[in-house]
Amino acid sequence: MAMTWIVFSLWPLTVFMGHIGGHSLFSCEPITLRMCQDLPYNTTFMPNLLNHYDQQTAALAMEPFHPMVNLDCSRDFRPFLCALYAPICMEYGRVTLPCRRLCQRAYSECSKLMEMFGVPWPEDMECSRFPDCDEPYPRLVDLNLAGEPTEGAPVAVQRDYGFWCPRELKIDPDLGYSFLHVRDCSPPCPNMYFRREELSFARYFIGLISIICLSATLFTFLTFLIDVTRFRYPERPIIFYAVCYMMVSLIFFIGFLLEDRVACNASIPAQYKASTVTQGSHNKACTMLFMILYFFTMAGSVWWVILTITWFLAAVPKWGSEAIEKKALLFHASAWGIPGTLTIILLAMNKIEGDNISGVCFVGLYDVDALRYFVLAPLCLYVVVGVSLLLAGIISLNRVRIEIPLEKENQDKLVKFMIRIGVFSILYLVPLLVVIGCYFYEQAYRGIWETTWIQERCREYHIPCPYQVTQMSRPDLILFLMKYLMALIVGIPSVFWVGSKKTCFEWASFFHGRRKKEIVNESRQVLQEPDFAQSLLRDPNTPIIRKSRGTSTQGTSTHASSTQLAMVDDQRSKAGSIHSKVSSYHGSLHRSRDGRYTPCSYRGMEERLPHGSMSRLTDHSRHSSSHRLNEQSRHSSIRDLSNNPMTHITHGTSMNRVIEEDGTSA
C-alpha cells in the first residue's frame, strides 16, 4: 500500500515535468511565504507543482486567497494551499500531494466566501486531481524524511525545466503572443542579442542602404514612365521587379525613421512590464509594414521568375513580343496573387513579428517554423525555377550562335545580349543566395543563441537557468548586417539594365521639355529584332530584302524597304522624285500564290504606315504620285523581281525577323 502511495504521489510530478520540459536547479530552500509560516515544516522547493518558478511568483498567485485565510473559513484551507504553493521538501525525486478529503473540506467550507469576494476556485486545485485518502498534510512519514535525509542524498540536483517566461515579459493572454514555445510571452526590446550602440549602428547602416536602393529602383521606374513603349516583353518584368524592390526599400527607410516605436511595445513600469517585441495583428502600423514588406519581397522574386520565363519563351520556342504580351494577364495574376495569398495566410495565423533591429515588421524573426515555410521555402523554389529556365534559355541562344552562321553584326549583338542576361542574373542571384544562406545559418544556430541568452539573464529575471549547457554562442552583428544589405541591394541590378546612352538622351530630352519620337532599341532588344529566325535559317547566298521600321522602337513594320527595291529597279536614270515614288509603290507589292506580284490597295498601305505619317498624306499627293508611274517602269520592276533568286518576305514575330540596323538607328 505504501509503495502504491509513493508511485501515485510521484505521478503528477512526472506529468508536470514532462509538460514543462526545461531547466533548473532542484534544492531545498527556506519558506518565505507569509501565509505558510508556522507550519510543521519550514523548507520547500521551487518550481512548485503549480508552475511557479520562485516563491515571489507563488506569493503573487496566493494573494487572492488572503481574505479567506484571514477570516479563517476553514482550518484545512491554509495547509491545503501551502501543500500546492510551497510543498514540503524531501529527498530528490519524492513529492507528496494533499489528500482529496482535505481538498473537499477546504472547498465546501470556503467556496461561498470565495464567491462573495469574486475569487473562482482554480482548475489546478480541482479535488479530483488528488489521491483518494484522508490524512493531514504533511504526513508524519513525510516529516521524518524531510528532517532526516538519507545518507548521500544530494543537497542540490540539476533538473531540466525549460524556459520560464519572466514576469517582465508576460503579455495579456488575449493577444496570442508566444516566445520560445511559451504562450503569453514576448522577446525583450531592445534586441536580446546586441547592445544599444550596435543597434544604433545597424539602424543607420540599414537606412543608408535603403536610400541607395530606393534611388536606384525609383530611377528605373521613372525611366520607364518617360517612355512606356520602350520596355516591352520579354524585358517588361524588370520594371515591375524594380517597383517591388522600390517598395521594399521604402518600408526599410520608414522603419529607420520610426526606430523601434512600431516594432516594440512600450514598457509599463507600474505593472513591472518591460518593453517587448510586437507580435500579431493588434498593432495596425506593424501589420501594415509587414503586409507591404512581405508582399513586395515575395512579388519581386516572382517577377524575377517571370522574367526568366519570358526570356525562355523568346529564346527557346522563339515567341515574339506580341505573343508573350498576350500572357501578361497570367503573369500579373501569378506575380501578385501568390504573394497576396501567402500574406493573407500569415495574417490569419497571426505570425507577424516586430524587428527591433531594422524597425520594421516581418515573419520568422523568432518563429523558426514560420521562417522555414513562409520565407525559406518560397525563396528556394523561386531560385530553382528561375535558374532552370535561365540556363535553358542561355544554352539555346548559345547553340544558335555556334551552330547557325550569322552576320558579324548579329553575332556581336547576340553575344552582348547573352552577357547582359548573365550579368543581370548574377547581380540578382548572388545577393539572394547570400540572404538565403543567412536565413539557414540563423535558423540552425538560433537555439544556441537563445540558450546563451537565458544563461546570461536567468538570475536577473529570476527564472530557471539552463541545465548542462555544452555550447554557448552569441550571433555576430555582421551576419544581420549582411542579411539586410543583400535583401536591399538585390533591387539595384534593375538600374544597370536600363542604363544606356538612350536613357541619357531620354532624360536630357525630358529635362529640356521635348521628347524624341521613338528610337530603335540597341542590343538588349535583340530578341525583338525583325526576322531573327529567318536570318538564321536562310541560305547565306540568298539576298535579303530589308524592311523599314518606320518610327517604331521594336521593328514591327512589315513594309519592304524602299531603298532595297529601288536597287532592284532598272529605272535608275529617273528623276529623284519619280525614283522615290517607284520605290514606294514597289514597297507595297505582294506576291500571289502563282508567283506574280500585285500592288497593295491603298487601304493596306494605310494600315501599315505609322499613324503620324498617315496624317500627312493627302489624296492629292497619293494620286499624283501614282499617276507619274508609267506602265513600263512597273512591268520592268516586276520582271526584274521575278528573275531574281527566291526572295524571303515574311511576316515574322519579333523573334523571327532579320537583325538589320538602318543608318538612322539610334
From Swiss-Prot:
Transmembrane segments: 206-226, 238-258, 289-309, 329-349, 375-395, 421-441, 478-498
Alphabetical keyword list: Cell membrane, Developmental protein, Disulfide bond, G-protein coupled receptor, Glycoprotein, Membrane, Neurogenesis, Receptor, Signal, Transducer, Transmembrane, Transmembrane helix, Ubl conjugation, Wnt signaling pathway
Phosphoprotein found in the keyword field: no
Compositional bias annotation for Polar residues: 550-565, 639-656
Keyword Ubl conjugation among UniProt keywords: yes
Biological process, per Gene Ontology: canonical Wnt signaling pathway; cell proliferation in midbrain; commissural neuron axon guidance; dopaminergic neuron axon guidance; establishment of planar polarity; hair follicle development; inner ear morphogenesis; midbrain morphogenesis
Membrane-related topology note: Multi-pass membrane protein
Pfam annotation, one family: Frizzled
Cysteines engaged in disulfide bonds, as pairs: C28-C89, C36-C82, C73-C110, C99-C133, C103-C127
GO molecular function: G protein-coupled receptor activity; PDZ domain binding; Wnt receptor activity; Wnt-protein binding
Signal peptide: 1-22
Expression tissues: Widely expressed. Relatively high expression in the CNS, including regions of the limbic system, in kidney, pancreas, skeletal muscle, uterus and testis.
One Gene Ontology term, aspect cellular component: dendrite
Positions with biased composition (Basic and acidic residues): 617-638
PTM field: Ubiquitinated by ZNRF3, leading to its degradation by the proteasome.
Residue numbers spanned by region Disordered: 538-666
Principal subcellular localization: membrane
Location of the FZ domain: 23-136
Positions bearing carbohydrate: N42, N265, N356
Subcellular location: Membrane; Cell membrane; Cell surface; Apical cell membrane
InterPro entries: Frizzled/SFRP (IPR015526), Frizzled/Smoothened_7TM (IPR000539), Frizzled_dom (IPR020067), Frizzled_dom_sf (IPR036790), FZ3_CRD (IPR041769), GPCR_2-like_7TM (IPR017981)
PANTHER family, sorted: FRIZZLED, FRIZZLED-3
Summary of subunit composition and partner proteins: Interacts with VANGL2.
Family affiliation: Belongs to the G-protein coupled receptor Fz/Smo family.
Domain note: Lys-Thr-X-X-X-Trp motif interacts with the PDZ domain of Dvl (Disheveled) family members and is involved in the activation of the Wnt/beta-catenin signaling pathway. The FZ domain is involved in binding with Wnt ligands.
UniProt protein name: Frizzled-3
Species this chain originates from: Homo sapiens
